[in-house]
């Protein structure tokens, strides 16, 4: 089991915690991690892009000039792709990019991502994360105290003050333990997780 330091919101070390290898020490499955990230991005795509092919563009029914004798290259329609205002070759159409991943694969991918953060020493454990008021400045001070810039902050449950205080910081995302996913864990440089959140993750996944 990995033993990591525990800090308070002032950035001072206040103890240590042993992380369960079943959650934070698994062998990284790169294939499933990649698959989970692609799945997350694909499922988030709107898929609403659309353009018209030559058969869908209005007009162009009349041949622009006669076939021979003009000196111009032969043309059959002003709506063919090489014309301004013409249709698009292989025009994109609205489609659903999402695909399914089974729960076991998602679980392995998430645990692989969490374990990679521990292996790379990119995890910071907080004894607790509580703010008396909704204040972005206070949240930023905590990140500064921990010497953290780009971070996914994982809390054990609902904490309105923390969530709303961190919302305006573009390099930070706050998530509850039941909201985290492989993509977010890997996207942010550092994983900041409360002690209670660690216990919750180990309870669910160990």
From Swiss-Prot:
Keyword Glycoprotein: no
Keywords: Ribonucleoprotein, Ribosomal protein, RNA-binding, rRNA-binding
GO molecular function, one term: rRNA binding
UniProt-annotated stretches for the region Disordered: 44-87
InterPro entries cross-referenced by the UniProt entry: Ribosomal_uL4 (IPR002136), Ribosomal_uL4-like (IPR013005), Ribosomal_uL4_dom_sf (IPR023574)
Gene3D superfamilies from the UniProt entry: 3.40.1370.10
Pfam families: Ribosomal_L4 (PF00573)
Entry keyword annotation includes Metal-binding: no
SS bond partners: none
Any single Gene Ontology cellular-component annotation: ribonucleoprotein complex
Any one Gene Ontology BP term: translation
Family the UniProt entry places it in: Belongs to the universal ribosomal protein uL4 family.
Known function: One of the primary rRNA binding proteins, this protein initially binds near the 5'-end of the 23S rRNA. It is important during the early stages of 50S assembly. It makes multiple contacts with different domains of the 23S rRNA in the assembled 50S subunit and ribosome.
Quaternary structure (record): Part of the 50S ribosomal subunit.
Name of the protein described by the UniProt record: Large ribosomal subunit protein uL4
The organism of origin for this protein: Lachnospira eligens (strain ATCC 27750 / DSM 3376 / VPI C15-48 / C15-B4)
Gene name for this UniProt entry: rplD
